[in-house]
């Protein structure tokens, strides 16, 4: 594992972007990891385990497209319209929607943040289809960052160990 010293200010991560192509242990919750992806100037897909996380961010974030629930033609049209707009794009989806999203976008235009990475392992027994969709598609993106806030599993506990490196922030 490669350890990086990550700067923090007032208890929040002080970064322009998340580390790339890694598993990032941010050590504690609420320190702004997801917020970095939502506020920077990079196109991001943010995959999360629950709809509630998306709804929470939709209420507090401008220019965020939330992809959850039934994948209706109206939702698909809205997504396509959003991706064709000018400017930076931020799409937050549940784990199970990622494969459908990959079919509709140019993945190399986006970085992928897989939030609450520890849930991929904890929930595999009852969400294997959704989790396999994440694991089968994350390398399609410009870069990826699997983020979690505690050491809940060893890297080799993954279904497949594709990750190039792990980043452990200290002092946050």
Where are these regions (language model features)?
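Interdomain hinge/linker at the junction between the two RecA-like core domains of SF2 helicases
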Residues: 159-172
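Inter-Walker segment of RecA-like/P-loop motor cores
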Residues: 62-103
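Pre-Walker A adenine-sensing motif
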Residues: 1-20
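Residue-level preference for the first positions of well-ordered beta-strands
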Residues: 20-24, 43-45, 89-90, 111
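Conserved Walker A/P-loop ATP-binding site and its immediately adjacent core
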Residues: 35-69
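SF2 helicase catalytic motif II
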Residues: 106-143
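Walker A/P-loop
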Residues: 19-38
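Structural recognition of the conserved hydrophobic beta-strand(s) that form the central parallel beta-sheet
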Residues: 46-47, 91-93, 113, 142-149
